[in-house]
């Protein structure tokens, strides 16, 4: 498990090529309100052959709750804008796929994409 505190700039966290059973969990810790910086998770090598599958729960700071899902075939970026808090788990399912689950609390919805947002 990796904890991330307040940071001084946007951060990119690059996951290695997926492998069955390889697991990473990332959570924020001690953020002050909305951190003011974005966090991007990406898969090393990326492209459409390595991707995320699954979804996360978005807890809007305006008290709305929604699900944010991958397209299940090509998204290799997870973009989290100005998080208040997050807890994300990635589990390698094969040599090309990470399953993703967790939640993000923010005023801005996170997004999965094929390129950095």
How would you name each of these model-derived features?
Residues 84-92:
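Extracellular disulfide-bonded cysteine-rich modules/repeats
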Residues 28, 81-85:
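Sequence/structural signature of small/polar-enriched beta-strand/turn repeats
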Residues 66-77:
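A conserved acidic, glycine/proline-rich C-terminal tail/linker
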Residues 1-64, 93-117:
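Exposed extracellular interaction/assembly regions and N-terminal maturation sites
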């Amino acid at each position: 498990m990796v904890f991330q505190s307040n940071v001084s700039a946007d951060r990119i966290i690059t996951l290695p090529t997926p492998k069955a059973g390889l697991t990473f969990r990332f959570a924020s810790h001690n953020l002050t309100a909305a951190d003011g910086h974005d966090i991007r998770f990406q898969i090393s090598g990326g492209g459409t052959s390595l991707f995320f599958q699954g979804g996360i729960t978005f807890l809007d700071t305006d008290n709305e709750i929604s699900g944010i899902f991958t397209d299940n075939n090509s998204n290799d970026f997870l973009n989290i804008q100005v998080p208040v808090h997050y807890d994300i788990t990635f589990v390698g399912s094969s040599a090309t796929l990470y399953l993703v689950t967790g939640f993000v609390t923010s005023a801005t919805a996170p997004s999965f994409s094929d390129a950095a947002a």
